[in-house]
């Protein structure tokens, strides 16, 4: 259950994993692309999860049609703008929208720096028009290797003053964190914060690596942390947040069932964990679903959900004054 008098945040929300089916159809036709289907319901199983996928990589393939229709920078701008509208429609007060410009640019050879600028423009316009607050997190897609990630980081850093953090996402097993230590030295030099997808497809060691070698202050998913009690204690003691995505973890087969999800164990250890969507359009869910449907399946109590909602603002990459402004706004509702 969502408490209206508290700010609602979504800190782990992929902009390029949230492209509307209608937009995929519209842009596909605009650019004359061969789509697997040409009406919404026939296209849905190609771009949205209809049952759990066998792996993270299989899940990620559902995102491919969304970025395949990004035929020019205006399309990127449109998708970014629509993402802000979707967040508003989901009752979200503050969203951190993350995106991989290399992945968005890849199909149509768009300039990476141009994609970054288009996304910034689209999100800023959306925030003006829809009256919600959003910030951007740039992703390096480890799936494509070290060189591609360097190109991606170079593009992201052209707009570093418009970003709050850098993330490492993609094939965690095939491209481990130690390959990207030099990339994150540059992130530190740029004075950007770090969140890393870790402990999703690989084990607790991947999370230690993200924290100790890459400088992560938040971890995306992190479900494998429960295999290492010392890591759990470290997360709690050092205030390292876990961006939890319940439905996503089921759909990627990262976790076998809602009942076995480790989010309750995080809370028991005093780890700051928050609730997020991940890829809403691909999953066919929104943030209220996670609070009202997924969380009760996990067995979270109303008091635990309240703490999770509070954690979402505490962990946000915002200044204390920005957080306080959101608290005051929500308290008046």
UniProtKB/Swiss-Prot annotation:
It comes from Aliivibrio fischeri (strain ATCC 700601 / ES114). CDD domains: ADA (cd01320). Belongs to the metallo-dependent hydrolases superfamily. Adenosine and AMP deaminases family. Adenosine deaminase subfamily. Zn(2+) binds at residues 12, 14, 197, 278. The gene is add. Binds 1 zinc ion per subunit. The keyword Metal-binding applies. Its EC number is 3.5.4.4. This is Adenosine deaminase. It catalyses: adenosine + H2O + H(+) = inosine + NH4(+); 2'-deoxyadenosine + H2O + H(+) = 2'-deoxyinosine + NH4(+). Signal peptide: none annotated.
């Amino acid at each position: 259950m969502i408490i209206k008098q508290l700010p609602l945040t979504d800190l782990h929300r992929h902009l390029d994993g949230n492209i509307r089916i209608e937009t995929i159809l519209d842009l596909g036709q605009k650019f004359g692309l061969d789509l697997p289907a040409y009406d919404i319901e026939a296209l849905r199983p190609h771009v949205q999860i209809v049952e759990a996928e066998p792996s993270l990589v299989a899940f990620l393939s559902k995102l491919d049609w969304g970025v395949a229709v990004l035929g020019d920078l205006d399309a990127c701008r449109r998708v970014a703008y629509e993402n802000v509208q979707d967040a508003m429609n989901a009752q979200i007060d503050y969203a951190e929208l993350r995106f991989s410009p290399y992945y968005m640019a890849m199909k149509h050879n768009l300039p990476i720096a141009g994609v970054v600028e288009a996304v910034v423009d689209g999100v800023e316009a959306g925030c003006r028009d829809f009256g919600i607050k959003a910030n951007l997190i740039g992703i390096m897609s480890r799936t494509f290797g070290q060189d591609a990630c360097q190109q991606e980081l170079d593009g992201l850093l052209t707009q570093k003053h418009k970003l709050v953090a850098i993330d490492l996402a993609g094939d965690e097993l095939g491209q481990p964190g130690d390959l990207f230590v030099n990339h994150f030295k540059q992130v530190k030099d740029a004075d950007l914060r770090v969140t890393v997808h870790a402990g999703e497809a690989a084990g607790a060691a991947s999370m230690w690596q993200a924290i100790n070698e890459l400088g992560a202050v938040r971890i995306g998913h992190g479900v494998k942390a429960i295999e290492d009690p010392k890591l759990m204690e470290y997360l709690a003691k050092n205030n390292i947040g876990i961006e939890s995505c319940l439905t996503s973890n089921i759909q990627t087969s990262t976790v076998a069932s809602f009942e076995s999800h480790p989010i309750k164990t995080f809370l028991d250890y005093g780890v700051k964990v928050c609730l997020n969507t991940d890829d809403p359009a691909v999953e066919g869910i929104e943030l209220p679903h996670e609070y009202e449907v997924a969380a009760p399946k996990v067995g979270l109590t109303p008091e635990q959900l309240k703490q999770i909602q509070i954690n979402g603002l505490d962990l946000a990459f915002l200044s204390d004054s920005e957080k306080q402004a959101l608290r005051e706004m929500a308290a008046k509702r």
